[in-house]
Amino acid sequence: MKDDQLIDWIHERYEEQKSANRLAGRFRFLGLETKYSIISIISGIFIGLTAALLNALASLLNSFREGYCTVNILFDKQTCCSTLTEDYECQEFFFWRNNHSVFVSCLIYVSVSVGFAFIATTLGYVVAPAARASGIPTIKAILSGYKYPDMNVFFSIKTLCSKSLAVCFSVASGLWVGKEGPFVHIATNIIYLVERIAPSLADSEIFTRQLLAAAMASGIAASFNAPVGGVIFALEQLASSSFPSLFTGSIWYEFLCSASSVVALQLIRSWHTDVGYLSYVSLDRRWSYKDTLPFIFISILCGCLGSVLIYLNMKFASKTKGFSKISNVFFVIFLSLITSLTAYAILGESELLFNPMELFPQVINSCSPSSSTVLCETTFWVTAIVLFTSALLGLLLTSATFGAAIPTGIIVPSLAIGACIGRAVGTLLKSRFPSLAGTSIYGVIGSIAFLSSTTRLVVALVVILFELTGALNIALPLMLATLISKWVSDSIIETSIYDAWIQFRNIPYFPSSNSLKFSIPLNFPVRSPEQLVRLPIRSCSIEELERAMHDSSQSFFVVLKNDTEFFEGFISRNKVSELLNRRPMSSNMQTTDNTGLDPLRSASAPVDSTFDLFDYIHPTTFTLNYDTPPVLMLKLFKDAGITNLALLNHGKLHGVLTKIDIIEYAKKCKTHTGNTYSELPTGVTYETDIFNRADD
């Protein structure tokens, strides 16, 4: 990791205040907050329209795996089958399995699935590598202060178009992926591009990240038709990031962006009701306190299995990390082949749609007169076996697919797996105790419990399920399920699946204070003065600056009082480079040349030129006494958002502690957990694992 990979939030706040007038741009009669509010509203409208388009396209492509609409080939199965016969049959939709032999219909089903998976891999990995996977882990790290190597690639028109199409094909292929996580990346891409229309507004790292947080909220809101849940989702993700207090100002932008996206989505749905995700779930009866123990059991079971999914997913990620580009493509095709064969077998035997986008609403809804699936027409033990089998297969397929070379999301697969587990348990209990709540309620409880175990979210999930299902009468069971599931999963695996991927990609990520514990004193790896490049504050020669730039890759240099070890401050590498580039014109440059030559000749002549660095010192330098308790040092990094801290001994430099060093230290502690001190690497004493969990 490099020192310049993280943002110094205090310095950014300083620069923001200093350049407020410059950021005002051409529309000076509008305040900055008004301009960013307008950007949030405009972006939210585009996000809502994009969500409507992608939902419709994904649903249409998904229908082609089963057949096509004879009335209009551009109608998906749900639209085509809006009117049923007296026998609850859909005559307008041409099903492959009803009009061809088993072999031919299976061949068509599998071929379409594999073809869609290949297209998704080509678009989301070969054409635009930045479009692969979920996007939420990287965006969460960016919001925490991570400087993505090339933001203009991660947020670009090419990435936006490729990921938008790729996520539709990946979902339509039947793979166990969701589109909600990738859509968060799509939403942040939209707001980033809208902000870039006004370059004067795009210079602030703080405001840019506040808008990205608003887009994250809007992406979830548009995906689930849950504006309040989207806002809380973004806030809960930001609460576990470094310097979360910085984003308190983003709540307003999140609300505006989420509300405008859902309004745009609802306007489209007003004349095309099938656009969007779920709007309402029918639960068969109310719950009672007799259901509390089964709810607790389901929550514990989902907490354990969610941790198993994270463990297996990271194992698959480690195995496929060294794959070539061709190998990654073939791996996705192989997953699609296995998934489609399994789905077709389950579809033929039980009429159960084995893909998370359709399985989840099937499982959490009560049986209707038109229901012909195994959930409603067979004995309880057959239903339970099919549901448990579906959950187990879904868990294995999701753990192998999430993070593969296509746009992948974890939210809907987790909901589907948990719903199968919950309804299976409810079915078994209902057969023995008829007075218990309906099986669909158990499905909802299982879905939120499993999702909580994989993402470690609590409040956001409860609100999203409220808005998604309309089931306000099960508020208490939902809250109980998320809490128990999170506690259980925290005790098994420390990180959420998002933070596990942040660590897997070696992205520098500094969690919040709630994610840290201290059992014994810490010994942080402090950089000694001998390890640092030191420059004099007065009469610093060009040769010293050039030597510092050449001999060190550090993002900062230490400035000391001349001929002493007294600390004066930090100077950034960029500032030194800037000084060297404009040294002939620097007003703060002192020269001893008195030859009277013209500037061009003087620049090429041997001149003893020096700089006074006082005016170029980092204006937000933080210092502490060298014997300050490490807990307080860590608190300063977390609460102030700084990246470098100078440790002094009576004004003299004792060493420098950086945020990157703390992150590396924590990783080494985690690697050697359980070892004796004699087995740890030399140079630093690792006394405890300071990261208890990376997502709270």
Swiss-Prot record:
Sorted UniProt keywords: CBS domain, Chloride, Chloride channel, Ion channel, Ion transport, Membrane, Repeat, Transmembrane, Transmembrane helix, Transport, Voltage-gated channel
Domain CBS: 527-587, 617-674
A family per Pfam: Voltage_CLC
Membrane topology: Multi-pass membrane protein
Record has Glycosyltransferase as a keyword: no
Molecular functions per Gene Ontology: voltage-gated chloride channel activity
Membrane-spanning parts: 38-58, 107-127, 215-235, 245-265, 292-312, 329-349, 380-400, 402-422, 433-453, 457-477
InterPro entries recorded: CBS_dom_sf (IPR046342), Cl-channel_core (IPR014743), ClC (IPR001807)
Localization per record: Membrane
Function according to Swiss-Prot or TrEMBL: Voltage-gated chloride channel.
Stated family: Belongs to the chloride channel (TC 2.A.49) family.
PANTHER family named in the record: CHLORIDE CHANNEL PROTEIN (PTHR45711:SF6)
Name of protein: Uncharacterized chloride channel protein C887.02
